[in-house]
A protein has these predicted regions:
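N-terminal cap/leader regions of alpha/beta-hydrolase-fold enzymes
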Residues: 6-12, 24-25, 52, 56, ...
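N-terminal cap/lid segment of alpha/beta-hydrolase-fold proteins
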Residues: 1-31
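Primarily recognizes the serine-hydrolase "nucleophile elbow" in alpha/beta-hydrolase
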Residues: 90-153
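Short substrate-entry loop that stabilizes the transition state in hydrolases
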Residues: 25-29, 37-48, 53-62, 70
Length: 153
């Protein structure tokens, strides 16, 4: 089952989805995973497929759009790396307070730029028990120069 939700990060309303395993029993608490999209991604692009796979493995899953992306509110012209970390932490908080989630068993997953975000988050937030990074970038400045003209900096 999928349920659309919203939560706040730094006072900005973010859009997300919760995915519930089909075999979840009333009163049961499962490990939870927050899935994070990359630089130009949105939660509805490829994360629903990943959420379904994790649901089949028994996890509660949450996807969301960062501030200024997809259905979330916020400035559309700004990329603020640390602000994305704060968004992931807010998503973890929201997921962790769901009655179906064991807040002692939270994981984060990110692809591309989302990989860099979850690695940083895991290094600075003790709630993270598991981190998966896929297709991460290695050098942020070099990468940014490859996708933006100098006059766009």
């Amino acid at each position: 089952m999928k349920k659309n939700i919203s939560f706040y990060s730094e006072g900005v309303k973010l859009d997300g989805d919760l995915y519930y395993p089909d075999d979840l029993k009333k009163g049961e608490r499962r490990a939870g995973v927050v899935l994070c999209h990359g630089y130009t991604g949105v939660k509805d692009l490829y994360l629903p497929d990943n959420a379904r796979v994790l649901n089949e493995a028994g996890y509660m899953v949450m996807t969301f759009d960062y501030k200024g992306w997809g259905e979330s509110e916020g400035a559309r012209t700004r990329l603020a790396p640390y602000s994305r970390v704060v968004d992931v932490q807010a998503a973890m908080t929201f997921l962790g307070i769901q009655p179906e989630v064991n807040d002692e068993r939270l994981g984060i997953y990110g692809t591309s730029y989302g990989c860099a975000t979850v690695v940083w988050t895991a290094a600075h937030d003790e709630r993270v028990k598991c981190t998966v990074g896929v297709v991460g970038m290695g050098h942020g400045g070099r990468w940014m120069r490859s996708v933006r003209r100098p006059d766009e900096w």
